Amino acid sequence: MMRGVTMVLLLPMLVWAGSECKARCCLTNISITVESDECGSCITVNTTACTGLCRTQERAYRSPVAPYFQNTCNFRDWTYETIQLPGCPLGVDSSFTYPVALSCECSQCNTEITDCGAFSMQPSSCHTHAYY
Protein backbone atom coordinates (compact mmCIF):
# COMPACT_ATOMS: atom_id res chain seq x y z
CA MET A 1 0.00 0.00 0.00
CA MET A 2 2.81 2.43 0.83
CA ARG A 3 4.45 1.86 -2.60
CA GLY A 4 1.22 2.94 -4.38
CA VAL A 5 0.98 6.11 -2.30
CA THR A 6 4.61 6.93 -3.01
CA MET A 7 4.09 6.60 -6.76
CA VAL A 8 1.00 8.82 -6.63
CA LEU A 9 2.97 11.47 -4.74
CA LEU A 10 6.00 11.20 -7.05
CA LEU A 11 4.04 11.46 -10.30
CA PRO A 12 3.26 15.20 -9.95
CA MET A 13 6.92 15.84 -9.08
CA LEU A 14 8.07 14.01 -12.22
CA VAL A 15 5.67 16.00 -14.38
CA TRP A 16 6.85 19.24 -12.77
CA ALA A 17 10.52 18.29 -13.17
CA GLY A 18 9.95 17.48 -16.83
CA SER A 19 8.56 20.90 -17.68
CA GLU A 20 11.09 23.10 -19.46
CA CYS A 21 10.40 26.25 -17.48
CA LYS A 22 9.99 24.67 -14.02
CA ALA A 23 8.04 27.79 -12.92
CA ARG A 24 11.04 30.12 -13.29
CA CYS A 25 10.94 33.15 -15.57
CA CYS A 26 11.51 31.96 -19.15
CA LEU A 27 10.31 32.09 -22.76
CA THR A 28 7.06 30.38 -23.65
CA ASN A 29 5.04 30.03 -26.84
CA ILE A 30 1.74 31.95 -26.89
CA SER A 31 -1.00 32.76 -29.39
CA ILE A 32 -2.43 36.24 -29.95
CA THR A 33 -5.86 36.61 -31.53
CA VAL A 34 -6.03 39.58 -33.91
CA GLU A 35 -9.38 40.82 -35.21
CA SER A 36 -9.76 43.57 -37.79
CA ASP A 37 -13.16 45.12 -38.47
CA GLU A 38 -11.84 46.96 -41.54
CA CYS A 39 -10.44 43.76 -43.06
CA GLY A 40 -13.19 41.45 -41.85
CA SER A 41 -10.62 38.96 -40.62
CA CYS A 42 -9.69 37.22 -37.41
CA ILE A 43 -6.39 35.37 -37.19
CA THR A 44 -4.25 33.81 -34.50
CA VAL A 45 -0.55 34.72 -34.45
CA ASN A 46 1.97 32.48 -32.69
CA THR A 47 4.82 34.25 -30.87
CA THR A 48 6.93 34.02 -27.72
CA ALA A 49 6.45 35.79 -24.41
CA CYS A 50 7.88 35.65 -20.90
CA THR A 51 6.16 33.74 -18.16
CA GLY A 52 6.98 32.24 -14.81
CA LEU A 53 7.78 33.15 -11.25
CA CYS A 54 10.40 35.49 -9.85
CA ARG A 55 11.80 35.39 -6.35
CA THR A 56 10.16 38.00 -4.18
CA GLN A 57 9.72 38.76 -0.49
CA GLU A 58 6.81 40.34 1.32
CA ARG A 59 7.97 42.70 4.04
CA ALA A 60 6.40 42.43 7.46
CA TYR A 61 6.59 46.21 7.79
CA ARG A 62 6.32 48.61 4.87
CA SER A 63 8.25 51.76 5.56
CA PRO A 64 7.08 54.98 3.91
CA VAL A 65 10.78 55.83 3.47
CA ALA A 66 12.05 52.59 1.92
CA PRO A 67 10.87 51.91 -1.64
CA TYR A 68 8.73 48.83 -2.11
CA PHE A 69 8.80 46.83 -5.30
CA GLN A 70 8.42 43.29 -6.52
CA ASN A 71 10.12 41.74 -9.51
CA THR A 72 8.04 40.28 -12.30
CA CYS A 73 8.93 38.16 -15.32
CA ASN A 74 9.60 40.63 -18.17
CA PHE A 75 11.11 40.78 -21.66
CA ARG A 76 14.88 41.39 -21.54
CA ASP A 77 15.42 41.40 -25.30
CA TRP A 78 12.76 41.46 -27.97
CA THR A 79 12.11 42.23 -31.59
CA TYR A 80 8.99 42.99 -33.62
CA GLU A 81 7.48 41.07 -36.50
CA THR A 82 4.89 42.37 -38.94
CA ILE A 83 2.29 40.38 -40.86
CA GLN A 84 -0.30 41.40 -43.43
CA LEU A 85 -3.90 40.81 -42.40
CA PRO A 86 -5.95 39.00 -45.05
CA GLY A 87 -9.10 40.41 -46.65
CA CYS A 88 -8.28 44.11 -46.39
CA PRO A 89 -9.79 46.39 -49.04
CA LEU A 90 -7.58 48.82 -50.96
CA GLY A 91 -6.63 51.85 -48.91
CA VAL A 92 -6.76 50.02 -45.56
CA ASP A 93 -3.48 49.41 -43.74
CA SER A 94 -3.30 45.62 -43.47
CA SER A 95 -0.10 45.45 -41.43
CA PHE A 96 -0.09 44.22 -37.84
CA THR A 97 3.10 44.43 -35.76
CA TYR A 98 3.58 42.37 -32.61
CA PRO A 99 6.42 41.77 -30.12
CA VAL A 100 8.50 38.58 -30.05
CA ALA A 101 10.41 37.94 -26.83
CA LEU A 102 14.00 36.76 -27.33
CA SER A 103 14.99 36.50 -23.65
CA CYS A 104 13.44 37.09 -20.22
CA GLU A 105 14.48 38.45 -16.83
CA CYS A 106 13.09 39.08 -13.37
CA SER A 107 12.92 42.87 -12.98
CA GLN A 108 10.61 45.70 -12.02
CA CYS A 109 7.78 46.25 -14.45
CA ASN A 110 8.64 49.18 -16.74
CA THR A 111 5.38 51.11 -17.18
CA GLU A 112 6.84 53.03 -20.14
CA ILE A 113 6.88 49.91 -22.34
CA THR A 114 4.66 47.41 -20.50
CA ASP A 115 1.06 47.21 -19.29
CA CYS A 116 1.73 46.25 -15.67
CA GLY A 117 -1.91 45.65 -14.77
CA ALA A 118 -3.65 42.36 -14.11
CA PHE A 119 -3.64 39.83 -16.94
CA SER A 120 -6.93 38.28 -18.00
CA MET A 121 -6.95 34.49 -17.80
CA GLN A 122 -9.84 34.33 -20.29
CA PRO A 123 -8.74 33.28 -23.76
CA SER A 124 -9.31 35.82 -26.49
CA SER A 125 -11.20 34.63 -29.50
CA CYS A 126 -13.28 35.65 -32.47
CA HIS A 127 -15.69 33.85 -34.75
CA THR A 128 -13.34 32.46 -37.39
CA HIS A 129 -9.68 31.55 -37.03
CA ALA A 130 -6.76 31.43 -39.40
CA TYR A 131 -3.33 30.45 -38.04
CA TYR A 132 -0.03 32.02 -39.13
Curated annotation (Swiss-Prot):
Q: Which InterPro entries match?
A: Cystine-knot_cytokine, Glyco_hormone_CN, Gonadotropin_bsu, Gonadotropin_bsu_CS
Q: List all disulphide bridges recorded for this chain.
A: 25-73, 39-88, 50-104, 54-106, 109-116
Keyword vocabulary terms for this entry: Disulfide bond, Glycoprotein, Hormone, Secreted, Signal
Instruction: Kindly report the protein's main subcellular placement as a broad class.
Output: secreted
Looking at the record's lineage, which domain of life comes first? Eukaryota
Subcellular location(s): the record lists:
Secreted
Please provide the Gene Ontology terms (biological process) for this protein.
Answer: G protein-coupled receptor signaling pathway; ovulation; positive regulation of androgen secretion; positive regulation of estradiol secretion; positive regulation of gene expression
Q: Name one Pfam family in it.
A: Cys_knot
Query: Which residues constitute the signal peptide according to the record?
Result: 1-17
**Where on this protein are sugars attached?**
29, 46
Work out whether the entry's keyword set contains Nucleotide-binding: no
Q: Name one GO cellular component term.
A: cytoplasm
Keyword Glycoprotein in record: yes
Q: What's an example of a GO molecular-function annotation for this chain?
A: follicle-stimulating hormone receptor binding
Alphabetical list of PROSITE patterns matching this protein = GLYCO_HORMONE_BETA_1, GLYCO_HORMONE_BETA_2
Tell me the Gene3D superfamilies matching this sequence: Cystine-knot cytokines
Query: What family is it from?
Result: Belongs to the glycoprotein hormones subunit beta family.
What does the annotation say about its assembly with partners?
Answer: Heterodimer of an alpha and a beta chain.
Q: What does this protein do?
A: Involved in gametogenesis and steroidogenesis.
Question: What's this protein's name?
Answer: Gonadotropin subunit beta-1
Its taxonomic path starts at: Eukaryota, Metazoa, Chordata, Craniata, Vertebrata
Annotated gene:
cgba
